[in-house]
């Protein structure tokens, strides 16, 4: 029994937070969670994949029982503080980058509107150049608290393939994340039988057969290997993770970047109120204006929320179950008149019970909290610089507050 958006208590409704993947864009989800806490919205279930899975694990297993939101923000600030700043190099190269990529034309300034457009264009240029620089920094040096390049000399003694890079299947080791997360996660909270914490669901994909892998704290002990698995994105050049003998996992975002279906499968009886964080917005207002924005928009579509069909089917199934309920009540009220044998009666009742246990949940409400994109750029999800992380956290909190306030006024 938990508070709704107006502060009233509702029985038999699960509050669910669904967190998408998206690299450094996961800081937006941190801000969203901060807003939910401030509005006293208790969560029953948290599901995530990739960086969303990392966020979810920190929230559900937080070592700070009273303020998991503060601990999650601390995690993101720690990542940003370990971002390798290459400003001295880029101070030298930036003018050339700007000239080559953005300033090889004369922008006319014949009226106030054009001046305003020019100022806005220059601002966008500066942000995009900064994101490009941040990407190069992460690619070259990694992030000590998250991932390290495999070519660093410290791996020479421990990596048997260090001197044969033609055999490499990954470029970055994200096992440093384990030590970092130990400061934030109490794994004893992420196991069956611990009902005082939100249920945690992480998703991954089996490298060999492409089937979904679901890690559910109500069914198994969640360990650091499961968090590494859900964030093992091969196109970021992270390695697969062996989660069981012979079972090798990659990032769940390869199958679905929005693990809503897994939530419905895991908890099929209790109705849901869903808060869905969209790091990659489904809808935008304008077409791309250059090839970089074309690639950016294509990526947004690939990783955007595609659960509309799941939501529609959930509602269709609810209508069917309501109809079955009506028919079943007619059956029970007239069972004696039907003169059915005991085996047939028992079979009908078993089927009725199974249908309700397997598919009884309904999505009562769903709140989409979508990140706005003022200056779209293909490298935005690799920018772990302090200013960007702080801005993402703030924008997530602001957007969540806006969505919650809008629903309260309805």
Ranges and model annotations:
Residues 1-49, 58-410:
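Patatin-like phospholipase
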């Amino acid at each position: 029994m938990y508070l709704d958006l107006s502060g009233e208590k509702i029985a038999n409704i699960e509050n669910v937070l669904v967190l998408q993947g998206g690299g450094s864009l996961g800081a937006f989800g941190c801000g969203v969670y901060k807003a939910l806490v401030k509005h006293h919205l208790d969560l029953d279930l948290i599901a995530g994949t990739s960086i969303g899975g990392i966020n979810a694990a920190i929230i559900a297993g937080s070592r700070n029982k009273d303020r998991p939101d503060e601990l999650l923000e601390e995690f993101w600030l720690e990542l940003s503080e370990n971002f390798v700043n290459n400003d001295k190099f880029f101070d030298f190269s930036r003018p050339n980058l700007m000239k080559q990529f953005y300033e090889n034309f004369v922008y006319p300034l014949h009226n106030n509107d054009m001046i305003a457009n020019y100022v806005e264009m220059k601002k966008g240029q500066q942000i995009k150049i900064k994101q490009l620089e941040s990407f190069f920094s992460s690619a070259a040096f990694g992030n000590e608290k998250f991932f390290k390049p495999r070519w660093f000399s410290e791996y020479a003694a421990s990596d048997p393939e260090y001197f044969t890079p033609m055999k490499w299947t990954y470029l970055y080791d994200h096992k440093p994340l384990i030590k970092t997360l130990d400061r934030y996660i109490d794994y004893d909270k992420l196991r069956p039988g611990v009902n005082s914490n939100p249920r945690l669901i992480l998703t991954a994909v089996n490298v060999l057969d492409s089937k979904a892998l679901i890690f559910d704290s109500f069914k198994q002990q969640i360990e650091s290997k499961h968090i590494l698995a859900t964030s093992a994105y091969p196109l970021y050049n992270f390695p697969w993770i062996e989660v069981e003998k012979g079972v090798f996992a990659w990032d769940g975002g390869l199958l679905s970047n929005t693990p809503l279906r897994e939530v419905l499968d895991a908890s099929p009886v209790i109705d849901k109120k869903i808060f869905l964080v969209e790091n990659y917005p489904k809808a935008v207002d304008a077409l791309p204006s250059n090839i970089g924005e074309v690639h950016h928009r294509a990526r947004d579509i690939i990783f955007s929320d595609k659960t509309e069909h799941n939501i529609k089917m959930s509602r269709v199934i609810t209508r069917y179950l309501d109809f079955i309920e009506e028919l079943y009540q007619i059956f029970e009220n007239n069972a004696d008149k039907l003169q059915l044998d005991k085996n047939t009666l028992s079979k009908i009742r078993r089927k009725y019970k199974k249908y309700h246990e397997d598919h009884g949940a309904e999505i009562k409400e769903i709140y989409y909290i979508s990140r706005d994109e003022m200056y779209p750029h293909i490298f935005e999800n690799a920018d772990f610089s302090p200013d960007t992380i702080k801005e993402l956290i703030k924008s997530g909190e602001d957007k969540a507050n806006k969505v919650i306030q809008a629903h309260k006024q309805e």
